Amino acid sequence: MDKYLPTGNDFVSLPRINERTGGIEDITFLYMAAKGLIDIRGSESTPLIQPYVHLDGVGSLSSAHLAWTRLDDWLPQSTAQLGSLELKTLYVPPIDERGFAIQMTVHNTSESAQDVVIGLNGCWASSWHCVNEDKPLSGKATCFRSGWNSSLIFEYHAGFPMFAFAPMADAQTDSSFTCSYDGSITYDLSHHCTIAADGTASVVFYWGLGFEEVAAATSAKEMLRQTFDVELTKTRTWLQERRVTFNGDAKLTQLYNTNLFFCMFFSTGITLDTEELVLVTSRSPRYYVSAAYWDRDSLLWSFPAILDADPERAKEMLSYVFGRQRRNFGIHSRYIDGTVLEPGFELDELVAPLLALERYINKTDDKSILSDPDIVQGISLILNRLRQHEAASCRLYDTFLQPTDDEHVYPYITYDNVLVWKSLKDLAQLAPQYAHLEKTADEIKDAIMTHCVQKDAEGKPYFGWSIDLNGSHDVYDEPPGSLQLLPFFDFCSPTDEIYRNTVAMIRSPEYKYSFANSPINEIGCPHAPHPWILSLANSLLCGRVEHCRAILEKISMDNGIACESVDEVTGYCTTGEAFATCAGFLCHSIREALL
């Protein structure tokens, strides 16, 4: 199975840089009019962009053994040996630029000059619309020469231009292209040079993205004019300002920072057509429900990590959430424009915006945000919608879908109601107009302790997963919303008898999804019956530090990037590759527990 090294910035994502070949298999970007993600792809046999170096007419990066590192834990860089040539390729999506750069450096180790060709070739085979499912676009792909960049323009039309991408280089480059009958376009960009003995040559290829020809070409030209060194320095400075170092643990440092930047650039992004910041599950089509919005995923998982690293970005996220997404708070999933994708009420998602807002204020002490009209209206909407789901006999609130998005067994879920308690209790402390919610929160806690606490055959109390207020309950847990987190939300102490009994039950070998006797002994559930990375994050947040350190040493996940679940023996990804919001929650939990 191929492994990938994703990278990206706010505007463009490179989800599939192939670790074996160095080829860029696709480029993705967010598009508001399409309600999701556009994916520009190569063919099965030829990537969209393949770096190559020819010595005496033979050789390429794809046939050499590539060794990989990441500058500042985010910018992929490969090194390889091709005969007497030492090759280095660096992939840089500069901060605040609508595009990316590929720097190719060749060092001649021989004692004589060498004629070398440094270039890129590839195939634009198809374009796709991605929101959960991937659907091919039916417009027309074109390629032509343009004076705007003195090179090629790749442009897509559906009655009018939808998007374009265009290359430029900082050295003299020859270009050619062929349009095939099947609609695919192949191309070649090449720089011919003679490298002296012990000499070095370098070429930077810039790729600009835009709505049409001029925007794409000038996006590339802007990076060219700024120069590669300036763009690289700016980007590395930005990354270094947000990196975290775990003293004496290089592996944990890399894991944290790579996942942090993956979260920042794959769970948020700026749309090409409207230039709005939006939040999504993942900007990688490799994730099985990509490019859509979930209140829970964005606000309970990715938001805490981004708030840790960049409070200003976190505030922008809240503006989007309480603006575009406000009217459908609590609905299963939505498109990036705020309209409903998958219907179904989820209680944890309804209060997720409150929890994120409270977290932001506690971190920054910026209470001015509470006077923002969108925030005021959003809080009012949540409180009104919450009342619609209140039980007739007590202060418990129902849900239709569980935190996995699967249908409930019983309507009153303990974890979800703890979130309601937490959100109202904290909101009551933020402003006088919400002080009355303190009493409501107390009544919710009383209802949880009265109705959600059950007893086993030996009379030991524990928290049931869900109840129906008619005496029925189930013993269960879900990593996306775990009972393990009750102390994290200050609902109870980690030493509380009821809590300890609950955790013992769901972690016992008798519990089907505990994986207690496996090397990766974290909790799963029927949605993905393997240990979840979210469960590992939950364990970090509830104090199982040494247990988690041991697992972090063993797991590979998705080539070092967080995924939904891993094999309980090998630690390799089993479901949910490129899970950007999960990457954020893993980072936040690592920072809370291990920094």
For each of these PLM feature ranges, what is it?
Residues 1-56, 75:
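Beta-strand-rich N-terminal accessory domains
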Residues 202, 206-219, 287-288, 333-334, ...:
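The feature captures the catalytic groove of carbohydrate-active enzymes
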Residues 242-246, 262, 298-311, 352-369, ...:
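Well-ordered alpha-helical scaffold segments within catalytic/enzyme domains
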Residues 259-271, 309-332, 374-395, 439-459, ...:
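Long, well-ordered core segments of solenoidal/helical folds
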Residues 288-392, 417, 577-595:
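Aromatic-rich carbohydrate-recognition surfaces in CAZymes
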Residues 335-338, 519-523, 550-583:
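C-terminal catalytic domain of Rieske-type non-heme iron oxygenases
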